C-alpha cells in the first residue's frame, strides 16, 4: 500500500471550534502550573520492559528531588506489583508532607475499592477516575450511547464518595478525566463533567481536578486551546475546579498544545520527564519547565543537575534521550557551524555576570542546568575560525589574533576534511603545535643573548641550520625583535605582533604571535610560547620564518 493521492477519501480534518471571541491568543503565561508527573504510570505502562520496584522507587525519589508535588505513582488495581509499590511509598515514609501521591482507576467498583485500599494510611492522595467519551470509543469500543457513558462516570463518582468516607483520616482529592476529551463533542464533555461535579460537590476550599486529555493529538494546538477556553468558560462551579491538561505528542505539538492550553485558562499540567509515554509520548515536563525559566518565570522545578536527572530517567526507562532533545540532548548546546561559533564566542566575550542572557544561539545558559561550556563549540568540517578560537581560549588560554584565526582555521579545515571526523580541543592544540610551535626547519633557535646599550638592542643568536650546521647571527635595532630581524640572512618585514599571558602567578607563560613577510612574499604567522616574553617573541619569529621558507620551497618544487 502507498500513500493516497487524495487522503481526504480516508482521513478528515478535525472541525474547528466556534469561538470568535477567544481571548487566549492575547494572554501570556505568568506563573508555573501545578505539575503532575505521570512517569510511573502513563510512562511506565508504555515501556517495553516496565520498571521493577527498585527502579520505580529511584524514579520517585528523583521526582521528589526535582520538586514535583503531585506524582501519579501507579494503577494499583492493575497488578500486585503496582499495589505493593503504593504500599511501600506509604509504609516506608517515602512521601514528603508537601507531596501528594496520585493513583488511577477505571470505573468498576472492584477496581475502585482496590485502589482506595492501596492508599490506606496516606495523609493525602489524589484518586483519578477516567472513562472514554468520544464518538469513536462510544461506538467502536464500548457500544454505548451518550447516556450510558455518562452513567458510567456518575456511578463511579458515587463510589469514590463511598470509599473515601471509609478512610476519613486521609485528605482526598478527586480527579476525573473524560478520556479522549480532545476528540469529544464539547457540549457532551461538559455534560459529563458537570454530572461528576454534582456528585463530588466541590468547594473553592476543597477543589476537584478535571483533567482534559488530548489522549490522541488530533488537531493543531490552537484548536486544543479553543477547547480549553470554551470549557473553562462553560463548566459549572469553575471556582471549585482545577483544570488540568494531559497532552500527547502524536502530531509533534504536545508542548505547544499545553502552553496554549495554559494561556487558555488551565491550572495544571500532567506529563513525563523528557516526554516518555504511549506512542509518541506525553508532553515533556522538562521542556515545559525550562521554557518558562527562559522567559524569566520560576518553574518551581529544579533542573540544576539536568544530566543527573537524565541519567536516572534513561536507566529506569531503558530509553535514550535524543541528542537533539530540547535543553538536555548531547548536541543542543553545541555549534559546529562556523558562523554560529563566531557569534557564540563573541556573545560569551560580552556577557557580563548579572546581566540579561543574550548569547546568540543559546536560549539558556548551560551552566544554569549543570552543563559545562566544553561541548558548546565543537569543530568539524563545517566549522570556522570562531569555534577553533573559542576552544583554544577555553581549554589552553591561547587567544589567536584575528588574521591568524583565519589562517589556522584553513589548516584545521584541511585536517577535518582529511579525517572526515570531528576534532576535539586537544587535537586542535596538537595541530597548532605541529603547524606553528614545532616549525623548526630550516632554522631552529638554540640560544640567544640580548644586550641593551645606549637605547639600542644587540642580539646574538645561535641557530641550528640545515645539515646540523651551527650558525651565529648578530643584529642591532631599537628593540629585541627589530635587532633579531636585522641579523637574519633574509629580508623580513614584521606586519603584526601580539602577546599575552597564559595563566597567572609563578606558573604563567607568555604567548607571542607574529605575522611577517619574507622577501615581499605573502604574510605568514608564527607562534611562540615560553616563560620569558622575549624568548616567546623570538620563537614566534622563527616559527613564522620557517613556515614561510618551507612554503616557498614546497611551491618551488
From Swiss-Prot:
It is an enzyme of class 2 (transferase). GO terms for molecular function: 2-isopropylmalate synthase activity; acetyl-CoA C-acetyltransferase activity; magnesium ion binding. One of its GO terms (cellular component) is cytoplasm. Residues 439-557 are annotated as: Regulatory domain. Pathway: Amino-acid biosynthesis; L-leucine biosynthesis; L-leucine from 3-methyl-2-oxobutanoate: step 1/4. It catalyses: 3-methyl-2-oxobutanoate + acetyl-CoA + H2O = (2S)-2-isopropylmalate + CoA + H(+). One of its GO terms (biological process) is L-leucine biosynthetic process. The keyword Protein biosynthesis does not apply. Its EC number is 2.3.3.13. Residues 33-307 form the Pyruvate carboxyltransferase domain. InterPro entries: 2-isopropylmalate_synth_dimer, AIPM/Hcit_synth_CS, Aldolase_TIM, IPM_Synthase, LeuA-like_post-cat, LeuA_allosteric_dom_sf, LeuA_N_DRE-TIM, PYR_CT. It is found in: Cytoplasm. It comes from the Bacteria. HAMAP family: LeuA_type2. Homodimer. Catalyzes the condensation of the acetyl group of acetyl-CoA with 3-methyl-2-oxobutanoate (2-ketoisovalerate) to form 3-carboxy-3-hydroxy-4-methylpentanoate (2-isopropylmalate). Belongs to the alpha-IPM synthase/homocitrate synthase family. LeuA type 2 subfamily. This is 2-isopropylmalate synthase.
